[in-house]
Amino acid sequence: MPEVQRMTLTQFLIEERRRYPDASGGFNGLILNVAMACKEIARAVAFGALGGLHGKASNQAGEAGAVNVQGEIQQKLDVLSNTTFLRVNEWGGYLAGMASEEMEAPYQIPDHYPRGKYLLVFDPLDGSSNIDVNVSVGSIFSVLRAPEGASAVTEQDFLQPGSAQVAAGYALYGPTTMLVLTVGNGVNGFTLDPNLGEFFLTHPNLQVPADTQEFAINASNSRFWEAPVQRYIAECMAGKSGPRGKDFNMRWIASMVAEAHRILMRGGVFMYPRDSKDPAKPGRLRLLYEANPIAFLMEQAGGRASTGRQTLMSVAPGALHQRIGVIFGSRNEVERIEGYHTDQTDPDLPSPLFNERSLFRASA
């Protein structure tokens, strides 16, 4: 049998551009540069310990244990991935600036390179704590429009709601490397052919099922959850004998890219909600380069993304590294959790069902 003729990422972008006769082509160039950065990172991840890239990054004193702006220990691959994104994307003339999880301030395009009309924000290596144990990690990115006429970008230029995104996506470095992308017209998945070095369209028009029996949450934080989340998880754990009348499965990988990918493939709901573990942090995940890109993908695939109180893409950012509570996935489940937040009368009073029937029963 003849091989299936698959569309390459380049061909896909050309087809998308044909829908907009006035488009300049610069956007396509930007996405292809992002894809190139992801290819380089995929290669580094694949070599693992053979490439000497496992373990913690060194600080200025040459000691293992460098810390980024988030106060998190950097892995060697965090640093390499960030450098790769900057190097591959700064020269093309498509960007006015970049911002990264690993950098405190926006990155200015060097003067000897032309400036473009877009902004790129990214988490160069999500889930990097999983590197040394060989669990899937990924890169997340979002494309925004830059303000016209500015000679240098500022933090304020990046503080746009998720609804302003031009494109978003992630690369998953797992058994295969995949690039999952939205340009505002659905969600499509591309698989990297390691022999040709090309991404091919393998998962067109991804759709998140509206219903699910699977949820992902870090249950070790259960004592810090707000009442609506406690109620939802308790009902799921009660299974067929509870108010939902069906059994649920729980998943947790500690890599949001891997969690999001599973949900895009087969449905589910992911929760890293606001909690009381650290009152100084209203959430764990970062709005601009983690929550918003995944929210755009979920909404474009028929799912939903929320804080529990409002849609993620309607949140007005207040800072480059702003953290936020995140709930996304199958639409009906996310809307149910939102409804529980709406019904909440006392934020400090958990549902009785949580204590009576949950596996995470509070101590007497």
Swiss-Prot record:
A GO cellular component entry from the record: cytosol
Transmembrane portions of the chain: none
List of residues binding Mg(2+) 2: D123, D126, E290
Chain sites annotated for binding Mg(2+) 1: E101, D123, L125
This protein's UniProt keywords: Carbohydrate metabolism, Cytoplasm, Hydrolase, Magnesium, Metal-binding
Cofactor binding description: Binds 2 magnesium ions per subunit.
GO process annotations (BP): fructose 1,6-bisphosphate metabolic process; fructose 6-phosphate metabolic process; fructose metabolic process; gluconeogenesis; sucrose biosynthetic process
Primary location class: cytoplasm
Domain of life where this protein originates: Bacteria
Pathway: Carbohydrate biosynthesis; gluconeogenesis
Cofactor: Mg(2+)
GO molecular function: fructose 1,6-bisphosphate 1-phosphatase activity; magnesium ion binding
EC top class, as a word: hydrolase
Entry coiled-coil feature ranges: none
Catalytic activity reported: beta-D-fructose 1,6-bisphosphate + H2O = beta-D-fructose 6-phosphate + phosphate
Binding residues annotated for substrate, in chain numbering: D126, G127, S128, S129, N218
EC number: 3.1.3.11
Compartments in which it is found: Cytoplasm
HAMAP family registered for this protein in UniProt: FBPase_class1
Family annotation (PANTHER family): FRUCTOSE-1,6-BISPHOSPHATASE-RELATED, SEDOHEPTULOSE-1,7-BISPHOSPHATASE, CHLOROPLASTIC
UniProt-listed NCBIfam families: PRK09293.1-3, PRK09293.1-4
Quaternary structure and partners: Homotetramer.
Recorded family membership: Belongs to the FBPase class 1 family.
Full protein name: Fructose-1,6-bisphosphatase class 1 2
Organism encoding this protein: Cupriavidus necator (strain ATCC 17699 / DSM 428 / KCTC 22496 / NCIMB 10442 / H16 / Stanier 337) (Ralstonia eutropha)
Lineage summary: Bacteria, Pseudomonadati, Pseudomonadota, Betaproteobacteria, Burkholderiales
